[in-house]
Curated annotation (Swiss-Prot):
GO terms for cellular component: endoplasmic reticulum membrane. Its main location: endoplasmic reticulum. It is found in: Endoplasmic reticulum membrane. It is a multi-pass membrane protein. Belongs to the PIGF family. Keywords: Endoplasmic reticulum, Glycoprotein, GPI-anchor biosynthesis, Membrane, Transmembrane, Transmembrane helix. Acts in the GPI biosynthetic pathway between GlcNAc-PI synthesis and GPI transfer to protein. The chain crosses the membrane at residues 40-60, 65-85, 107-127, 139-159, 184-204, 215-235. Pathway: Glycolipid biosynthesis; glycosylphosphatidylinositol-anchor biosynthesis. This is Glycosylphosphatidylinositol anchor biosynthesis protein 11.
Amino acid sequence: MPPKLKATRKSVSFQHLSDEDISKSQYILKTEFPRIETSTLTIPFHSALLIFGLYKFGLTNDIYGVMLKGIFSLIPLQLLYGYLITTRSEKEKKTKSHNNSENVPLLLAGGIVISLVLSVPLFVALILLGAPLASHLKETYLLSIHLSLLIFYPSLVLYKYDYKSLVKFLDADGVYNAIAKNQILLSAVLAVIGTWFGVIPIPLDWDRDWQQWPITLLTGAYIGSFVGGIACFLFQ
């Protein structure tokens, strides 16, 4: 009786496939989506300067009035910041279309309009998440405008209103690492986180003027925006 032959086991190198998939994902993130060159020009220094100015001009004494004036200061600063974003966008530099450069003013102005429109659903979200409903509605809405201009506007300029491209980017593998290397997106994420942390001091029994709604949330958003931009630059 002939001896039984041992069945040979086939093995597949999943490590190789994994590395190939990761490399493909990194290639897609680098080529299909807008990127920004890390630079001191795209650090949102104006975020730190503006929140300092708001306190300097009496934010704790006249919350509504100073926040309203702050919006009229923030809009031109964001327009300038948006222009700097277009000059540092790597995809913009690689494209050969001449129309893109001609439409920069329209892109920047349209981004402001869209951000102001997006402040309405953001205002509703703030109410649903616990913002005072019986009082401070005007202050909450001004907060939503500040947040929308800080968080949405730079991304709108970078992605040129391409919602589908942004969704595909957020759904791609390695997106967290890509966000950490993108000054615009990291600033937006840390602005959101800063706003969330800004809620913490409000109920504390310290009896300070700066604990009034929504000063700490506004402060957290501006600081988060600045920290995101400078952290990406320093740790790139």
